[in-house]
């Protein structure tokens, strides 16, 4: 299983520069049934990342839309069916080809959408359900990726939708000079991120619908070690007083109970992808992407996550450090053979 995921990630990263974190965490989210938001300036390949994710699933249907304050629910969830209104006086949407029938969804500029769209997305993301007239339909949705170059405005009731995006990633421009030059010289026909439905079907590493359903049940059976729960408790406690700025007071970073539950699903999925029957402490390393509320909190939270993971071994590390210091302080210097003896003592 691990080797297959490595090959799949290799295929998905081909022709895309420095987006390994975005793609690997998005695949993790897709297998866990969670959603991702990419934050970053325009032109940093956020949409390209989302398009590559449909390549992970054989025969996947995708839907993408650029939001604006003028976007209507019809554009996202499908127009009202005139035929249904005429023949049976039923208010239903013609959903084929729109979000309710897609496996992978990409919504750009998510915070520009109006309340009617955003409120419907709450149920879509969390329960994978969509109410179409008097019927409630189960969605085939495996992953919803949203993108924005700004955080949700405060005081406008967007906190619930923001909380639904379990993984939050800051997407940045290309930093390595070598990759930047390769990108400049790349012609359009060679560019990555243009996976077609046919390519998704042809990819032998792509995940089938049957495998996805089977793996979802297998992920539920993954165990959790006690030391993982101890580490999570330590992280949760540390979030009550995060030192973001030395000059400012420590802040309480709030993480909802629902969010912690979704994070545990990610951890189980991580263990499954690595052929393990139990979640290990190492699976916790990327969860700082799930915990921050403001971008400036990210590095501080990453540091406290690492500290919590290594805290149980701190005493042993100190003991090893002290022993090493003693070995350096006192060591044996062998003199030349004709002097006939060794010297052992403290080296100043």
Where are these regions (language model features)?
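Conserved alpha-helical scaffold flanking the Walker A/P-loop in AAA+ ATPase domains
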Residues: 25-28, 82-105
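Conserved C-terminal "switch" segment of AAA+ ATPases
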Residues: 1-2, 15-16, 169-248, 276-277
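Walker A/P-loop
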Residues: 27-69
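Canonical AAA+ ATPase core
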Residues: 83-88, 104-117, 123-206, 215-218, ...
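Conserved RecA-like P-loop NTPase ATPase core
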Residues: 18, 26, 38, 76, ...
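C-terminal engagement/docking regions of AAA+ P-loop ATPases
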Residues: 245-255, 261, 269-348
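Short loop/turn elements that form and flank the Walker-type P-loop nucleotide-binding site
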Residues: 24, 31-33, 58-59, 99-101, ...
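Pre-Walker A (pre-P-loop) alpha-helix and adjacent loop at the N terminus of AAA/AAA+ ATPase modules
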Residues: 2-41
């Amino acid at each position: 299983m691990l080797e297959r995921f490595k090959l799949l990630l290799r295929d998905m990263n081909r022709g895309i520069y420095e987006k390994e974190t975005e793609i690997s965490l998005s695949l993790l989210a897709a297998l866990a049934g969670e959603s991702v938001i990419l934050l970053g300036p325009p032109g940093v390949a956020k949409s390209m990342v989302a398009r590559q994710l449909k390549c992970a699933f054989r025969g996947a249907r995708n839907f993408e839309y650029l939001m604006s304050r003028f976007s209507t629910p019809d554009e996202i969830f499908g127009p009202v069916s005139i035929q249904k209104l005429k023949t049976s006086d039923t208010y239903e949407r013609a959903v084929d080809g729109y979000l309710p029938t897609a496996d992978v969804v990409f919504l750009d500029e998510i915070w520009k959408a109006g309340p009617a769209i955003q409120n419907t997305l709450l149920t879509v993301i969390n329960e994978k359900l969509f109410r179409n007239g008097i019927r409630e339909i189960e969605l085939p949705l495996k992953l919803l990726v949203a993108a924005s170059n700004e955080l949700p405005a405060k005081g406008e009731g967007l906190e619930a939708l923001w909380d639904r995006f379990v993984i939050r990633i800051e997407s940045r421009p290309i930093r390595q000079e070598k990759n930047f030059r390769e990108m400049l010289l790349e012609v359009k026909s060679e560019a990555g991120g243009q996976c077609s439905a046919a390519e998704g079907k042809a990819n032998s590493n792509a995940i089938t619908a049957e495998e996805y359903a089977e793996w979802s049940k297998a992920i539920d059976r993954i165990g959790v070690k006690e030391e993982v729960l101890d580490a999570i408790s330590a992280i949760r406690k540390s979030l009550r007083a995060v030192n973001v700025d030395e000059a400012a007071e420590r802040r309480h970073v709030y993480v909802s109970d629902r969010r912690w539950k979704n994070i545990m699903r990610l951890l189980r999925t991580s263990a499954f992808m690595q052929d393990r029957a139990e979640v290990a402490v190492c699976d916790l390393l990327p969860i700082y992407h799930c915990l921050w509320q403001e971008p400036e909190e990210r590095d501080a939270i990453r540091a406290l996550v690492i500290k919590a993971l290594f805290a149980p071994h701190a005493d042993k590390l100190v003991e090893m450090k002290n022993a090493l210091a003693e070995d350096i302080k006192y060591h044996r210097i062998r003199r030349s053979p004709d002097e006939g003896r060794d010297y052992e003592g403290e080296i100043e």
